[in-house]
């Protein structure tokens, strides 16, 4: 699998996983990979409820389900209240970013 294939799979499966799963408090989701490990990072605004954590874990599972064995998943679910800089500790692939006045100029690609 080429890097382009991996990137495309991550983006497609993350988008599918996010359908009907984005709470208002989710500020961003970024992804990346290292070897055969997919890394996902969810950034929330305010307290993170157990329901929010479960939704994030389901999205992560949807992402890694698009890859054959031996691919694995690492998840990071963090609180970074607005207007904290979303670029700090972001992974390279931006899958979702909530509209905020501070999101202008983010590397969305």
Features from the language model and the residues they span:
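Short low-complexity stretches enriched in small and charged residues
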Residues: 1, 29-31, 71
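Polar/charged, Gly/Pro-rich intrinsically disordered segments
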Residues: 74-109
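Short, non-transmembrane amphipathic alpha-helical segments
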Residues: 15-18, 48-72
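Short beta-strand-to-loop capping motifs
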Residues: 42-46
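Short edge beta-strands and adjacent turn/loop segments
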Residues: 21-39
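Residues at or immediately flanking beta-strands
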Residues: 39, 72-74
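N-terminal presequence-like segments and adjacent domain-start helices
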Residues: 1-11
């Amino acid at each position: 699998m080429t890097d382009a294939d991996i990137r495309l799979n991550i983006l497609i499966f993350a988008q599918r996983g996010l359908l009907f799963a984005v709470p208002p408090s989710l500020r961003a989701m970024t992804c990346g990979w290292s070897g055969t490990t997919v890394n996902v990072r969810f950034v929330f605004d305010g307290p993170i409820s157990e329901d929010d954590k479960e939704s994030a874990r389901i999205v992560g599972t949807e992402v890694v389900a698009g890859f054959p064995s031996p691919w694995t998943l690492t998840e990071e679910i963090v609180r970074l209240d607005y207007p904290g800089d979303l670029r700090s500790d972001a992974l390279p692939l931006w899958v979702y970013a909530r509209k905020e006045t501070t999101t202008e100029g983010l590397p969305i690609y």
